[in-house]
Amino acid sequence: MGERVLAVIPARFGSTRLPGKPLARIAGKPMVQHVYERVRQVQGVDRVCVATDDDRIARVVEAFGGEVVKTSSEHRCGTDRVAEVARGSDATLVLNVQGDMPFVEPATVEAVLALLLADPSLPMATAKVPIFDRIAWENPHVVKVVTDRRGQALYFSRSPIPFWRAGEPSGPWGFKHLGIYGFRREFLLEFAALPPTDLERAESLEQLRALEHGYRIGVAEVQEGVGIEIDTPEDLERAEEVLRADGPQ
């Protein structure tokens, strides 16, 4: 029997810099619809749903024909929300695609899924893209990841890693972590039950919880990235400009 793949888009109404973010309109559609339609294009996914505790988001998703699962309002993070959906599902693999990525490339999500399909012992996977801009590499809002020779995560940080002691590198400054995750269902439920760890709290990066507890995270290197991630009104304006010009980049 093959794997059953569930893709979940966690969406919450509250946002410090952009309240109601999932419902912000880009080119006439709510952002959550852009994400949903792109995830529907991912090869190998059997089911796509939006997980939310907000009735306004739920109504919008139902209006465009998407599946919505109402979840608790008590979750600490998006992964906990995804885990609640997984708990009531018969899926064997679960993808978590953030709801602020209206330009996410289906191929990027497929690369994460491919790691889990290729290695049945791998509990968790994610993705990275090269950083060629020093300013982005130094930006604490851009999460970096370093991996071993097998492509598995050694560490994630908001700090600029690795440190180039001898000067500028000949290639990329580092790799940006993309907020797309794949889990084996049983590990996702275990992960959500683990207590937060010191490094997770220090960096405010929940994936460090897995590393600190000794679990492997496979990291797919991709070139497409996820395009513009929407966190501010300025990001929304840029997204509109991209769609007006020549479609998603």
Regions found by a protein language model. Give the residues of each.
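Conserved alpha/beta core of the MobA/IspD/sugar-nucleotide pyrophosphorylase nucleotidyltransferase superfamily
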Residues: 170-249
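Residues that recognize and position ribonucleotide moieties
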Residues: 16, 24, 102, 181, ...
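N-terminal glycine-rich phosphate-binding loop and ensuing alpha1 helix
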Residues: 3-51
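Hydrophobic/aromatic residues located in beta-strands of well-ordered beta-sheets
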Residues: 7, 48-50, 94, 125, ...
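Short phosphate-binding loop-to-helix
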Residues: 49, 55-114
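Conserved core of the sugar-phosphate nucleotidyltransferase
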Residues: 104-197
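Short, high-confidence coil segments that cap the C-terminus of an alpha-helix
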Residues: 45, 91, 119-122, 215
